[in-house]
Amino acid sequence: IRGAVAQNTTAPAYPQIKGYFSVLHPIATLDQDTVVYNFVDSYTVLVPVGLNLLKSDHIGFSFELAPTIKVENGQDRVTSLLFHPGILFRRNHGVTFATRLAFETNGRYGITPIFNQVVVKRTDVSYFVAGSLPARFGNNKPGTIGIAVQLGVNF
């Protein structure tokens, strides 16, 4: 048949395991009385690394660990380690909505909704940007909600 071309459109096999590495910058955190901005009196950065177990094109489970590093008055230190498991709701065009539980070694806990967008996709690697709204409670401190931006690589 003229114009007919055979196509090999094999669907990806699931489950799949993917890893990632990223850098997360908190922008601001709001508690009952104040807004604390990153980069003003101190600088805080998180370095999330994790594994995603993808069940299908639409859903997966993620296991993440993220050390928190704070630089203040010329001193830097790791202030906590975040255990951040969650469910991934994958959409079309590289968009993912993640719902994560948060357990920090400093005694805080909470939830983190995350909107993630793949911005560059290659055969073996993709680069993403994400925005998150972490809500934290516990450790005899007022509840907080923040906003953060994350840049990373999936492999």
Model-derived features: positions:
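Transmembrane beta-strand segments that form the barrel wall of outer-membrane beta-barrel proteins
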Residues: F21-T34, G60-V71, G94-N106, S126-F137
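Glycine/serine-rich loop-strand microenvironments at binding/catalytic pocket rims
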Residues: Q7-N8, Y14-L24, T79-E104, L151-F155
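Bacterial N-terminal signal peptides
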Residues: I1-R2
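Solvent-exposed loop/turn segments connecting transmembrane beta-strands
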Residues: T34-Y43, V71-T79, R100-T112, R136-G146
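Mid-chain, structured segments of secreted extracytoplasmic proteins
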Residues: D57-H93
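Short loop/turn motifs that connect adjacent beta-strands in outer-membrane beta-barrel proteins
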Residues: Q7-K18, L53-I59, G94, V120-Y127, ...
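Feature captures outer-membrane beta-barrel proteins of Gram-negative bacteria and organelles
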Residues: V45-K55, T79-R91, Y109-V129, I145-F155
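Short glycine/proline- and aromatic-enriched beta-strand/turn motifs that initiate or cap beta-hairpins
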Residues: V5-L54, G146, Q150-N154
